[in-house]
């Protein structure tokens, strides 16, 4: 009798162990901010499997949508180990969104903690993950710096921060340094007082207008040809290489063929570029897709068409397309 009890108990323990280890199908309701990538990480599965199980043709999901997922929740796997860090060094491919997810924070918390005015990051930049905010400089340093005529950009700086420090405005700083966007780089030397350099270009520049239609800082012909050369490259969430791109990774890759910009999100590009009424070749067009606000972007190539990394890979689409037309937010210039 004793032997039978032990055997039965063992069977129950083994059975419950096997049952606990098995991945089970479950229904989840999509919450605000969710993406297929988030869910695939959380439930230890893949985007392809989720799309296949739910007959999805794209990566777009909606708040309140019910999805069937085969997998196990991994939400508490790494939160405790990552939360002990107080700083983080930005790596290639990082974004505020990725870092905030990794350390259980919000993008706004990260930006406030590091005095960031936009979502742009630079490789090698050190971000604070805990501690007091670095929103403004002390009044004493503001007074002592007023006699300085140049300033070398440090990690975490922004035009807004520098303008506040030297008692000037972002517009004046940009004019003084001939800047066409709010993007600045570590070790860049900026004039904080003096004469404007914005009008130093020769007046007759019509011979080069065909290659610089929308921006004086980018060769538009090269931008478009570099982008078109990538048509057919597959879609990959967070991808920044020719093995696969997401929409902002594609833009980052093409821009870095000519200049040096940090990896950021579509929202980051939206907030750092200059608004224009209508796009010219080489400008950037923005859309709202799986969440409110800018969440997808592409490069305008003329004839009401744009090139972008969509769910089917890098492709050329029309702004009149029945999907894109109602989701169009506007155009920006680098």
UniProtKB/Swiss-Prot annotation:
The keyword Disulfide bond does not apply. Residues 217-334 form the NlpC/P60 domain. GO terms for cellular component: extracellular region. It is found in: Secreted, Cell wall. Disruption phenotype: Cells lacking this gene are about twice as long as those of the wild-type strain. It is an enzyme of class 3 (hydrolase). Its EC number is 3.4.-.-. InterPro entries: LysM_dom, LysM_dom_sf, Murein_DD/LD_carboxypeptidase, NLP_P60_dom, Papain-like_cys_pep_sf. Residues 1-25 form the signal peptide. Residues 72-87, 132-153 have a biased composition (Low complexity). It comes from the Bacteria. Induction: Expressed during the exponential growth phase, under the control of SigA (major) and SigH (minor). Is also positively regulated by the two-component system YycFG. The active site is at 247 (nucleophile), 296 (proton acceptor), 308. Keywords: Cell wall, Cell wall biogenesis/degradation, Hydrolase, Protease, Repeat, Secreted, Signal, Thiol protease. GO terms for molecular function: cysteine-type peptidase activity; lytic endotransglycosylase activity. Residues 70-89, 131-153, 195-215 are annotated as: Disordered. Transmembrane segments: none annotated. One of its GO terms (biological process) is proteolysis. Belongs to the peptidase C40 family. Cell wall hydrolase that cleaves gamma-D-glutamate-meso-diaminopimelate bonds in peptidoglycan. Seems to play a role in cell separation during vegetative growth. The N-terminal domain contains LysM domains that are thought to be involved in peptidoglycan binding, while the C-terminal domain is endowed with the catalytic activity. PANTHER family: ENDOPEPTIDASE NLPC-RELATED (PTHR47360:SF1), MUREIN DD-ENDOPEPTIDASE MEPS/MUREIN LD-CARBOXYPEPTIDASE (PTHR47360). This is Probable peptidoglycan endopeptidase LytE. It comes from Bacillus subtilis (strain 168).
